[in-house]
């Protein structure tokens, strides 16, 4: 479980703050889930071969996502 958050840095991007304190930088967050404050349940895969300018959290590929 976590919350979608919009970060207004580096041109702006959406991330997910996990309830456990972890932060995630999804590379493929669906447009319909790009809503600041949206509670979500996510299954994701860590992308070890990817880089990001955001430097916000673990880079992940969303496998499954649902609003809560």
Question: Which role fits each region the language model picked out?
Answer:
Residues 14-19:
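Short, acidic/hydrophobic/Gly-rich beta-strand patch recurrent on exposed beta strands
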Residues 11-13, 39:
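Exposed beta-strand and adjacent loop surfaces of beta-rich binding modules
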Residues 50-68:
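OB-fold/S1-family single-stranded nucleic acid-binding modules
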Residues 21-34:
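Beta-strand/loop nucleic-acid-binding surfaces
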Residues 32-38, 68:
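A short, structured loop/turn motif at beta-sheet edges
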Residues 8-10, 22, 48-50, 68:
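Residues that cap or initiate secondary-structure elements
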Residues 1-10, 44, 66:
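Structural detector for short beta-strands of small beta-barrel domains
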Residues 37-51:
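Flexible glycine-rich surface loops and low-complexity tracts that mediate binding to linear polymers
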């Amino acid at each position: 479980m976590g919350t979608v958050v919009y970060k207004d840095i580096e041109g702006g991007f959406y991330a997910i703050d996990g309830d456990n304190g972890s932060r995630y930088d999804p590379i493929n967050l669906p447009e319909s889930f790009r809503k600041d404050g949206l509670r979500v349940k996510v299954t994701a895969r860590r992308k070890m071969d990817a880089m990001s300018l955001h430097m916000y959290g673990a880079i992940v590929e969303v496998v499954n996502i649902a609003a809560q």
